[in-house]
Amino acid sequence: MSERDFNTQSPKFKDENANSVISQSDFLGKSLKNNNDDYSDFRGSYLNDKSSFQTPLRNGSYQPKGSLEFTPLLQSSNKNSDKYNGSLGDKGSFDPNSYGLSAISKQATQEALSISQGNDSYDVSKLTDLSKNSEIDHTDGELPANAALTLREQEKVLEKVSRENFGLRIKIVCLEKRLESMAPEQIKEAVKDNVELHAERANLQLQLKRTESLLQKSEDKNFKLEEKVDYLSKVNDVEQSQNVKVFTERIRFLENALEKVQREKDSLSTEMEEDKSNKEVDYEYEIRQLQNRLDELSEELDVAQDLLTEKEDEIATLKRQIEEKENSSSAFENEENSSYVHLQEDYAILQAKCDEFADRIQVLTADLEKEKENQIMHESEASIGLTDSMQVHTLQEQLHKANEEIEFLHDQISRMNEEGKNFEDIMLQFRSLEEERDVLESKLQTLEDDNNSLRLMTSSLGNQIESLRTQNREIDEEKNHLRLLASKNSDKALAETNIRLQEVTKELETLRMKNSNDLNEIHDLREENEGLTLKIDSITKEKDRLINELEQRIKSYEVNVSELNGTIDEYRNKLKDKEETYNEVMNAFQYKDNDLRRFHESINKLQDREKELTSNLEKKNLVISSLRETVAMLEKERESIKKYLSGNAKDLDNTNLMEILNDKISVLQRQLTDVKDELDVSEEEREEAIVAGQKLSASFELMSNEKQALELKYSSLKNELINAQNLLDRREEELSELSKKLFEERKIRSGSNDDIEKNKEINVLNSELADKLAQIRHLESDKMELDKLVHHLNRGIEEANIEENAVKKRLCLLMGCDYSSVSILQIVSQIEHFVNQQIQTIRSLKQELRHDFVQFSGKKEQELSRSFEKFGLGTETKHDILAQRNRNVSEKMNDLENAAQKFFSSPDRKNGYLYPSEHTSKIEYLEKTIEDLKLALQDELKNRNLLMDDISSYNKQTTKLQEKIKWLERERSILIDELESYRSNQFNYQNNLVQDKNELEERLKEIQKELEVYNNHFMKQAELMTSNVTDESQLMLKTLREALQSKTNNIDHLSTILERNRKEYKSLLDDYNQLRARYKNLQSNTPQSTQSGQYESEIKGLSKLTKYLQSKCRREHSLRLDLAFSKKFILMQLTGYETCNKINLRMLQKIGISPDPDLSKKHIKLKSLIIVVCSIERMKRMKNEWLKQAQLKQSLQRAAAKAKTANY
């Protein structure tokens, strides 16, 4: 895994303001300043030792100081520490030259895991909770230069990638299942033949399930909508019936009340004369009753307003449902686009398969040619001692086999052409799917237009509701006015209440009309929903049909793949052998590496042992030398004592001294013997170590040789892989070139005048290809004859170079004569006679081969003539091509025969002896001619392969052009059908517009009639009120005039709606005329810009996208592992520091030294320090972001306020 450095990205806290964060950071900074003097020394002890903070590299070394760190904790601590000489810029960027952390190895990760699992003293959630609310703000899935994601952010990104690449996962699963049952050498072919088809089938099934689920959801939604509509209609009916009943009852009640009031008025007029004192009391009572009745009327108006609000809510819900339907239709379009992309991928895969089959046929032909050459060599070596009849028989069998192989190859080519035809059918169906997609798009546009019309209707309903609200306001004002009048005159109040009741009844009638209109609109919406459901059902049926057709095609391709598996099985064994050898080489490398490590370890141990032994020897030598000196001193003393005793033998005390000295000497001698034994043992061990070292060195040399051999194998395998990759690149380049040629050919094909010339050129190229194929076959036969001659000449060269005696002995053994009685000249004459016989047999064989070849070429000429007739060539060109072919072959055969005759009919060979110098020169001449012929053969073979490729490409081009013509004809028919459907839709739309226009005119007439009635009624009321004209009556007149103005405004609004409808009708007519002109242009000008390059660009884009996604997944996986390990490593270091401090304190306590309690209390832990520093830095960074967010909120609030004021 590559080593990378990262910068932290500050998380965004949700429930905090910028001012609160600033206050927290200030508080933490002050608390740190107060304790800074106490723990500075404690922190410096750790910071001065930079090796303690460095993480180990993968190979055990340390990273240089210039690299950036990759964890949020250490980076923030380094930024706030003065010991690292780091500097933060204006944007808070860290100076990497101050200090950095290096990458981390796998062993360190395992140690960190073991330590973190064993130690529960540190809670990881305290650190990870800081990054919970971090957001991912990256573009195009790539990380910025100075950012590092947390684990949860990485998980979110991975979830997005997994959702986007669900199809890739399915392909991977299918590949793994298939690879378990296949040989490793057939992986590429299997992936391209079977696995991708299964994956695409799974994708199609998933798409089916999704579409079915969407359809079920849409059906459920439609069913719910229908239920809601039914329920609303029932509710409206019930409410209308209830409202009618309530209003009728109220009207009757009010009429009865009015009658009662009038009766009471008559009674009051009689009673006024009798009892004037009670009149005022009765008046007040009646006024109160009238006020109560007015309150009841106001309550009824409130109920009507509530009903209006409920209907507005229902209209809003219907609008939402319409928008949801639009969203569902957009989702359906996206699914259709995805299916379209998958079909394009199918097309690219099948095209790649065709190219692979063509390459495979070329490889098989090359292998067959090589096998033929090897067979010819073996048969020529074996046929030296055989008879002429056996040679003829074997040559005939070889020719028969070669013909069978050629026929087999032709059959394979025909199969490939059939597969290409199937592929063409798939392309036609694919284009039909595109056409259906366009039709669906047009249908969706019509639906959008219908939705727009519904929106306009809803807007008109909203305007009507607003007008009703204004009327309600006017009614409220009139009620207030009535209350004022009731306080002054009861008679006037009664008259006004009567008038107002009549107006209320009229308004109730208008409300009923509006309710009926709303019900009609609901009915229309229900019909539209039913139409949408029918359209969705038709679309699902079409999709099911297409899916069934695709499944049938997939089954047919599976059958073809099963037939091709027979050819694939032959190559599996080769791949298995190569992979086994590769695995053996890699295992051997591993074993050898382990043995080398062990060997180095044993050598190091032996060297250490040798050093120990040498040190022991030196020590023992020093001891021996010291002991020898002491022994010499003691012997001298002994001799001196003996001399002294010999002089004074009578002294008994001296005898005791002698015994003591003898004991000392015996002890020293024993020590000497022990030292000598130890030296002998050490020397033996040293010799054994030397022998073991020699054995190990020998084994090391063997291992190094084996390692070199394995490295050579590994390099050879690596070169083979590189060659395979180069071949793939070449194939891709050839594909791109072919695609360019196809695009050019399509452009050229679009012109009608250039078609005849291009057909002629294609015919000429086909004739040339046929000639070259015939020449190649003749050259193959010539090659076989030349191989035979080369073999004989090489044998003669070998015999000429051998010494005369060896030649004589071998010739005598071959001829069956004695070595002493026969001379060299006689043996040479016999050999020449045998060679002449062989030449005659070769000539007879050549004649037979020519006869057979003439028959075979006759058949081929017939086939060529048929091909010429297909392409429209004449007989003259055919005879010219065949004559040139025969001339070339005859010239090459004559050259070979002349060279052989010159060699065998030389004057020296006639005399019976051939000098070695002349012999070598002639042989060199023949070798040169043979090499020239070989080069010519190779050139012809290359030209043949190129011509075969050109033939296949031209055949493909012709088929594609024919398909294109068919597709254009179909497209034309589809456009005609669309025009007809559009005309029918336009006619229906015109009829609908006319009906709407008539309805609006009728409605205008009705409104005008109502206005006339209202004006008449108003005039009558004015005549009645002229007798009692007061200030209050003038106010009433003003209110009535305002009501008239509102009605006139409504009339103006309806007239504007009519004008809008007329304008829309004109715009639709203009669009219809434009479409008609466009259709005429399409008929006159055929589509020159085809979508030929589109498929290739899309295929390339998809391949690049898959590679990018694979690299992205790998990169994210590596990032996740590195981040997890870095966190665990930091935790390990922190726990290590804590444990070290605890151990040191315990040691000091055991010794008896205890630190001051003040110091221990004021010391701050490294863990808490890091957390505080991180929080301060993050809050500082978040300050600017929160300020920006606050500014944005303020600007949005201002914009909303402006919008509200503009609406009002």
Curated annotation (Swiss-Prot):
InterPro entries per UniProt: Cnn_1N, PACT_domain
Protein's cellular compartments: Nucleus; Cytoplasm, Cytoskeleton, Microtubule organizing center, Spindle pole body
Record's subunit section: Interacts with ccq1.
Compositional bias segments (type: Basic and acidic residues): 1-17
Coiled-coil residues: 151-375, 387-803, 874-1091, 1177-1204
Biological process according to GO: mitotic spindle formation (spindle phase one)
A GO molecular-function annotation: calmodulin binding
Disulfide bond entries: none
Stated name of the protein: Spindle pole body protein pcp1
Gene: pcp1
Superkingdom in the source lineage: Eukaryota
This protein's record includes keyword Nucleus: yes
Organism: Schizosaccharomyces pombe (strain 972 / ATCC 24843)
Compositional bias ranges of the Polar residues kind: 48-64
